[in-house]
């Protein structure tokens, strides 16, 4: 038999027979290693222990000590057990893609005989547990691609997935009458799946394309230890309670009307108040930092986006152009930068004017697929807190640091502390996706990296995450659901100033090219509101809360006028307050104020009327305190003015 040469992590090389598996290699080293092994790497790719090795390459044995791979193998095996169980109960079921996610797995299925309901999951879980208790080993067999197609005949989606496999051999996993593939790594036997849970059922288009068949996606998770599963389920429950879609419904913040269209939210009065407060804050903050706010059209001639490059590189995310019938094609703008360039070009510019900072709360439209839409986080119409600075080359580093400092000030005002920095570069292997200028990319990426190093900030580097016209610094955070989101962005751009032939008159009297810096402080109003709703769990800080205080008179006939006087004074001071004079019990009104997450509940009765005080109960606290009404009003006005949750100005996370 032919031989292959395998290279170990320490550089040592050894010859083995062709088709040797990594498990065989582990056994040749030691029995204990083979027992601990759960997977391996071949030329950097994670593969199954029993994957036949057909050519020379570098190998690595992965043991249970590698928690990440161990979890992935656990999730793959649990998904395999799920599919094997479903195949017994639904013989006609078609199986699609199976995927290990960041915290579990899902399997896409299609069953013409009937859908799997959420209420079916407990019974399916019971049957899975029986299969796991059997302790049956999972057999592996390597077959040719043609033989695999024969094995999966009748499984439409599996055959389609096989067509995408480039290798001539396919590793097939078998358990009883059920077979599957593309699940590496997997555990050795079904009883290795110790603790698992089936979570939910949702719809998903085959391979994510809305033109394809809608399938059923069954979600689950599994862990080696019960306490790990319990912790995960607790986290998921907490995430559900923080879900901005749930809270948005409870607090009457927004809704989406299917008659109008998916991804097009209506902002209800409460949500609109929160958004308006954010917008006013942002405008004031930016103006104080040298930005000039503008309004620009949400429609533009298609030629503008052809010149900017959006039409070539971003077309799939843009709505189709509107033919005006006279040769003019109008496009809903996907980004604001070309519009701000036109503002810059409206006047001749001098080096003395730079940096020129232009900002806008600019409405944009993105052609998002329906399957990607989610509440306020992913929408088709959005308003971006956008800004563009035009600088001389010698101003780049200082302006970058200035923008980053402004961002961190904003995070402090919103009490946001959990975020990381990511330098997003182009993928040099994907030249079609990005503006093709190696010198520009290398220069811009080096500048961003140098600025971050100068500041001593930790960051990760990510290839393939840049925009098509330049690298960027992304500020990353996680939603309550555990999804990573980009909170803010700073991006260097040498391309658009060249495409639009931007100039300024230099000190030497000659024309020079400015550098453009794109930045978004808090993403879109939609996404930022969703994010804040989740991190605050709906208990917005007083300055953002739709209703900042509710006043409850003990007896309307005796105490209403006093309550109204307090309300009028608070409104005069710019506060949002209402009186609850409904004919309901006092306890009911107080509980409702708490469930509505109103920051302050004020009760006024005989004592308060006689002493010009209010009984103040802060949200989340059990006890009320008596305060002079004027002192309370002064205190809440100061709290709102400080943009904080506790009446104190928060400090920056880092000093620049």
Swiss-Prot record:
Its EC number is 6.1.1.3. It catalyses: tRNA(Thr) + L-threonine + ATP = L-threonyl-tRNA(Thr) + AMP + diphosphate + H(+). Its main location: cytoplasm. GO terms for biological process: threonyl-tRNA aminoacylation. Binds 1 zinc ion per subunit. Keywords: Aminoacyl-tRNA synthetase, ATP-binding, Cytoplasm, Ligase, Metal-binding, Nucleotide-binding, Protein biosynthesis, RNA-binding, tRNA-binding, Zinc. InterPro entries: aa-tRNA-synt_IIb, aa-tRNA-synth_II, aa-tRNA-synth_II/BPL/LPL, Anticodon-bd, Anticodon-bd_dom_sf, Beta-grasp_dom_sf, TGS, TGS-like. The keyword NADP does not apply. Residues 243-541 are annotated as: Catalytic. Catalyzes the attachment of threonine to tRNA(Thr) in a two-step reaction: L-threonine is first activated by ATP to form Thr-AMP and then transferred to the acceptor end of tRNA(Thr). Also edits incorrectly charged L-seryl-tRNA(Thr). Belongs to the class-II aminoacyl-tRNA synthetase family. This is Threonine--tRNA ligase. The lineage of its organism: Bacteria, Bacillati, Bacillota, Bacilli, Lactobacillales. The gene is thrS.
């Amino acid at each position: 038999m032919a031989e292959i040469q395998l290279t170990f992590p320490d550089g040592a090389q050894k010859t083995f027979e062709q088709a040797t598996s990594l498990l065989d290699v582990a056994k040749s080293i030691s029995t204990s290693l083979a027992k601990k092994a759960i997977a391996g790497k071949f030329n950097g790719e994670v593969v199954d222990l029993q994957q036949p090795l057909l050519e020379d390459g570098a190998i690595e044995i992965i043991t249970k000590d590698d928690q990440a791979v161990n979890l992935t193998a656990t999730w793959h095996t649990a998904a395999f057990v799920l599919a094997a169980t479903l195949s017994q109960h639904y013989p006609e079921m078609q199986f699609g893609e199976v995927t290990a996610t960041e915290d579990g797995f899902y399997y896409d299925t299609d069953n013409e005989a009937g859908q799997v309901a959420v209420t079916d999951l407990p019974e399916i879980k019971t049957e899975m547990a029986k299969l796991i208790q059997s302790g049956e080993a999972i057999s592996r067999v390597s077959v040719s691609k043609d033989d695999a197609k024969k094995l999966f005949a009748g499984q439409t989606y599996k055959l389609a997935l096989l067509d995408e496999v480039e290798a001539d051999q396919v590793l097939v996993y078998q358990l009883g009458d059920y077979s599957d593939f593309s699940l590496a790594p997997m555990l050795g036997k079904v009883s290795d799946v110790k603790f698992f849970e089936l979570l939910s059922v949702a719809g998903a288009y085959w391979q994510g394309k809305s033109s394809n068949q809608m399938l059923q996606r069954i979600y689950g998770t599994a862990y080696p230890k019960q306490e790990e599963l319990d912790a995960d389920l607790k986290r998921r429950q907490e995430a559900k309670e923080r879900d901005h879609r749930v809270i948005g419904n409870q607090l009457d913040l927004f809704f989406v009307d299917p008659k109008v269209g998916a991804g097009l939210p209506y902002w209800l009065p409460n949500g609109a108040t929160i958004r308006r407060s954010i917008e006013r804050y942002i405008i004031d903050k930016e103006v104080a930092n040298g930005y000039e706010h503008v309004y620009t059209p949400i429609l533009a001639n298609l030629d503008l986006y052809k010149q900017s490059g959006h039409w070539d590189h971003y077309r799939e995310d843009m709505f189709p152009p509107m033919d005006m019938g006279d040769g003019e094609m109008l496009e809903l703008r996907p980004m604001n930068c070309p519009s701000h360039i036109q503002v810059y070009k409206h006047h001749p510019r001098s080096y003395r004017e730079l940096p020129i900072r232009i900002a806008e709360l600019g409405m944009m439209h993105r052609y998002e697929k329906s399957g990607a839409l989610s509440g306020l986080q992913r929408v088709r119409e959005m308003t971006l807190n956008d800004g563009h600075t035009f600088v001389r080359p010698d101003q780049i580093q200082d302006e970058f640091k200035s923008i980053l400092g402004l961002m961190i000030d904003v995070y402090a005002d919103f009490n946001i502390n959990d975020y990381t920095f990511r330098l997003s570069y182009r993928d040099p292997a994907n030249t079609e996706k990005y503006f093709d200028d190696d010198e520009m990319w290398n220069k811009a990426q080096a500048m961003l990296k140098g600025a971050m190093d100068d500041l001593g900030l930790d960051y990760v580097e990510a290839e393939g995450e840049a925009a098509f016209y330049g690298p960027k610094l992304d500020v990353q955070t996680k939603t309550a659901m555990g999804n990573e989101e980009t909170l803010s962005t700073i991006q260097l751009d040498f391309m658009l100033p060249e495409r639009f032939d931007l100039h300024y008159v230099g000190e030497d009297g000659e024309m020079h090219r400015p550098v453009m810096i794109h930045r978004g402080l808090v993403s879109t109003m939609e996404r930022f509101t969703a994010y804040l709703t989740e991190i605050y769990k709906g208990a917005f800080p007083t300055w953002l809360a739709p209703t900042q205080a509710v006043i409850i008179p003990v007896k309307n006939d005796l105490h209403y006028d006093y309550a109204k006087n307090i309300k009028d004074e608070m409104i005069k001071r710019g506060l949002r307050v209402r009186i609850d004079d409904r004919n309901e019990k006092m306890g009911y009104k107080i509980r409702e104020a708490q469930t509505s997450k109103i920051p302050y509940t004020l009760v006024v009765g005989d004592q308060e009327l006689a002493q010009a005080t209010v009984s103040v109960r802060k949200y989340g606290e059990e006890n009320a305190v008596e305060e002079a009404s004027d002192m309370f009003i002064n205190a809440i006005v100061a709290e709102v003015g400080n943009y904080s949750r506790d009446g104190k100005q928060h400090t920056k996370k880092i000093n620049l």
